[in-house]
């Protein structure tokens, strides 16, 4: 797998797609999320569900995270140099990457090399990646101090949501699909309504 991964990186077989984020209030695109797909040399597409778990197991996910981050920073840098308006493009970061030595320094350097504002590349962490402990707390504080905005992805899919909300400085809350699936029944509506209210009271934006 590692040999195939190295070859794929060299040939830029990992393709970054941008999924738009819309504001319900303004009906405008307010940003995007970077998604990655593996387009093999022979043209076949490999879904993230197939390769991400393998890369997480082998530790290759750290290199893929940085690859995607570099691509997004490059996109934002090119738009700035072309005089175009930039909107934030969020990038997912795995738990393995958070624990990787010098991760923050490496990511800060990439942002600075591309001459872009930190706010243009928010970092998304899943509940699992952001499971609260002292080490995670310190690392996340360093990321915020460096200038990054943090989004909690898949909120409501795990068991540590409230602890993470209470202890970690997230800017945006992204509701998990499992919550949205119950929006048509009364209890589901109440859960979503109060979750949004809680997030707003903490000064956080909410995405679904």
Predicted segments — roles?
Residues 7, 11, 23, 41, ...:
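Nucleotide second-messenger and two-component phosphorelay signaling modules
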Residues 110-183, 194-208:
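The catalytic core of metal-dependent phosphodiesterases that act on cyclic dinucleotides
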Residues 26-32, 60-136:
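Catalytic core of bacterial c-di-GMP phosphodiesterases, primarily the EAL and HD-GYP domains
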Residues 52-53, 62, 141, 189:
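Conserved long alpha-helical elements within nucleotide-processing catalytic cores of c-di-GMP signaling
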